[in-house]
A protein has these predicted regions:
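N-terminal "cap/leader" segments of large eukaryotic alpha-helical scaffolds
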Residues: 1-42
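Boundary/linker elements of alpha-helical solenoid repeat scaffolds
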Residues: 2-15, 43-56, 89-96
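Generic alpha-helix detector with strongest preference for long hydrophobic helices that associate
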Residues: 4, 8, 30-33, 37, ...
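Residue-identity detector for glycine
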Residues: 8, 18, 33-35, 47, ...
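Generic structural signal of hydrophobic/aromatic residues within well-ordered alpha-helices
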Residues: 11, 23, 27, 45-49, ...
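HEAT-repeat alpha-solenoid elements in large eukaryotic scaffold proteins
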Residues: 30-49, 78-91
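Extended alpha-helical scaffolding segments
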Residues: 53-137
Length: 137
């Protein structure tokens, strides 16, 4: 049985080093190939970007939040938006800092509005992001 992490795996090495184009390619491949934030595999549950988050250095995760915000702002479907929010949250947590990237700060009000319009998991992910930043967003 193959893993969802096999989808787009050729882009992980470049994405973990801060390549925005590779991050977009990874995102597009995973959303098209699976489209959900998690998968229950044979012996474990994995997140859509677990491999990237495991390998990316914290300083690079911080830098890639801006790219993930750009991806998020372009999403029109529930699944795309939800997966983009999950990517943002994963990078935010991996960044190991409570310093809010400026692009995220600027876009967060619009992201919240869109999350509330979709409802459900996107709202929960926004709450997680806010909690990481100690509710300063």
């Amino acid at each position: 049985m193959s893993s969802i992490l096999d989808i787009g795996s050729e882009f992980v090495a470049e994405a973990k080093n801060g390549d925005f184009t590779a991050l977009i390619q990874l995102f597009d491949a995973r959303v098209k190939g699976w489209g959900k934030t998690m998968a229950h595999e044979e012996e474990m549950t994995v997140g859509l970007f677990s491999d990237l988050v495991y390998e990316i250095p914290s300083y690079c995760a911080f830098d890639m939040v801006d790219s993930a915000v750009d991806i998020c702002m372009q999403q029109t479907s529930f699944d795309g938006f939800n997966c983009a929010l999950d990517l943002i949250a994963s990078l935010v947590i991996k960044s190991n800092t409570t310093e809010v990237p400026e692009k995220l700060r600027a876009a967060f009000p619009e992201i919240l509005v869109k999350s509330k319009r979709f409802g459900g998991e996107p709202v929960d992910i926004c709450t997680l992001i806010r909690g990481h930043y100690r509710n300063t967003l």
